[in-house]
Amino acid sequence: CKILEGDILLSLTGNVGRSCIAYGKNNLLNQRVAKLEPIDKGWLPFIYWMFNDSKMVSLMNNLATGAAQQNLSPVKLSKEKVTIPSESFINLFCSNTIDIFKQIILLNKQNQKLKQARDILLPRLMNRTIEVE
């Protein structure tokens, strides 16, 4: 399954219940990560914040099983009853938070570029290939 920028991913193994917004290119999904796909793509901000809510994270942690490594079953999770607000509320929420959602993606991309620059520059500074004035 191909991952597109803005897709919401959910960890199913290890640190179960951790969600993030995908960014970048050429990402693929494996069996221990779930892709959360709302029927309406405009609802991505709501889905992201819902799965980051402390009550939802707690629910997912309580559903996880396994002694050596915790595993969250998507089947078990999908059977849980969760209170969902009205469609009009979700639309209002998303229209007010879409810019924040986009900013998260942008900042993640910028952080990635800064990490790449650090990884290039730090060895050069340590080897004195370049100097800071």
Q: What are the residue ranges of the model-derived segments?
A:
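A short beta-sheet element
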Residues: C1-N52, M56, G66-A68, S73-V75
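Amphipathic alpha-helical coiled-coil/heptad-repeat segments
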Residues: K41-G42, F46-W49, V57-A67, V75-E133
